[in-house]
Amino acid sequence: MEEQEDTTSTIVQANQVAENLNNETFRTTKPGVKRLLLTFAVLLSFILGFPFLWKSVEIYRSPLPFAEIDSLNHESLHFPYHFQAIFLSPDPLDSSRLHSSILTEISKSTPYRDLCGSSLSKFSLSVVVDSPNNCHRTGSKFSYECGSINRGDFDSSDENHIDETLKKFVGEGRVYTVVVEVVGDNFVPRGVIGKHRHAWVVSKMSSELKTIVAEIMVKVFYHGGTEEGSIKSEFIPVGADGRIILSFNLLNSDPHDWNFDWDFKSIDETLLVPVIEALSPIANITVESQVLFYTPKASFSSWDEKMKSHVFYTRDLPFFVNSNEWHLDTSTAAGGRSNILQFVVYVSSAHECPLKLVLPNGLISSTNGFISPMWGGVIVWNPIDCIKQGSSRTFLSPEDMHNILEVFLGQLRQLLGLKSDVSFLGSFVKFKLLPSEKGFTDWELDMLSRQHTCFNLHSTATTLTSLSKLVKSLPRMIIIDEIGRQSGKTGD
C-alpha cells in the first residue's frame, strides 16, 4: 500500500511541474506585429540579396557563334574565274555556237573537286571570233580589241616573243585566254602554254577544237596541270607565321678525300632572288646556307659492274638521310612556327665515288637527287673523275652551282605540288610549257595562291570547330568578351 501511495504522489508532482513549465515558457496569445515585421524583413533581405549572390558565383561566358563555326566545315569556297577564247579565223564563225560548245566541254572536264571542296562552277566565259572583216563576241566582255593580234605573229619560231606579244593585248587582269589560229588542213596542230595567263593553239577548224580549248582552261589554268596521283597541295610547306626558310647545306662526307666549299651569296643574288620575289604573295621566304664536314649517309651502296659506279636504290631513300650526323637545323629565327625546307648537296666519299641513284625502271636518275615531302630535297654530287684532292679547299664552279640550283628549283616546285614537265599531253594536242625565268609562271602562282588560301581556311575551320566542341563540353569555362569578338569575325 505504501508503494502505491508513493507512485501516485510522484505522478501528481510531475503533472504539477509540467503545468508550471507550460505556464512559464509558452505564449498564450498570438505573435505581435513586431515579430511579423522582423520575419518579413529577414525574408525580404534574402530575396533582394539572392540576385547579388547568384551574380557573384556566375561564370561569365561571352556569346559565341557556334552555329556559324560548325557550318565552316560544310561550306565550299568558290573562286571566280574568267576565261576568254579568241579565234583568229579567215572565215566568219558562229561565236554563240562556239560559246555553248566550250561551256559544255568545261562542265565535262571538271569531275573532281579541289582542296576547298569546290568544283569549277563560278566562272565567266567570253568567246571572240576575230576575222578580217567581222568581229563577233559572245559572253562576258573583256579588254581585248579585235584586230590587235595578227595571224602572222604565230609564224615566228621564237615562242617567247609570241608569248610577250600576246601579253600586250590579252595580259591585263586575271583573265585566262586561249588564242586559236584557225589554219588549213595541211598544218600540223600545235599548242603552247605561255608563261603568263594565256596559251595559243594553231589548228584546223574541227569538232575537237572546243575540247582542246576547254582542256587548257580546266586542266591547265584551273588545276595547274596537276593530276591525281601527283604530290597534293596538303604538302604546301608554309609555316603558321607565313614563312618558309630555305636551308641550303653542302655536306662533305669525308673531308680527307676532298674539301668542297661554295660561294653561295653570288648564287643567292642571281638565281634565288627572282624565285623569292615570285613566291612573296604566298609566303615570306628567307634563305640560309652552311657547309658541314664528316657527314656520312645512313644507307649503304653497292658496286654495279655494268654501270661502273656505286649505286643506291629508291628503296634506300628512307635511310639515306643521317639525322645523327647531319646537323641541318641552322635557323634560330624559326621559333617553331616557320617551316624549314632542307636542300642538301651530298658530296660522296672517294671509296663510293661515283655514287648514283637507280630509278625503279632500272635507269640512272638524271638529277641524281630525290625529295622528301615537307622536309626538302637531296642531290648526290660526284667530283670529276673522283680523284682525291686532299684537305685543300676547292670551290664549286659557277656552272656546277647553276646546275645544282636548277635541280633544287625543280624539287621546290614538286614540294609545292607542281610538276616540272616541259609539256602537257592533252586529248588531241601535246602542248609545250614555256618555262619562266623566275621558276614559276603566272598561272602556276595563281593556283598556288588559291591552294594556299584553301589550305589556311581548311586548317582554321578545323581548329575553330575543335575549340567550339571543347567550349560546349565545359559549361563552367570563362569566355571573355575579346574571345567573343574575335570568334564573331569567323563568318566575315
Regions found by a protein language model. Name each.
Residues F169-T465:
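Extended, non-transmembrane interaction/recognition domains
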Residues Q4, M447-D492:
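Membrane-proximal extracellular juxtamembrane segment immediately upstream
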Residues E2-L292, P296-M307, V311:
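Long, solvent-exposed N-terminal ectodomains/accessory regions
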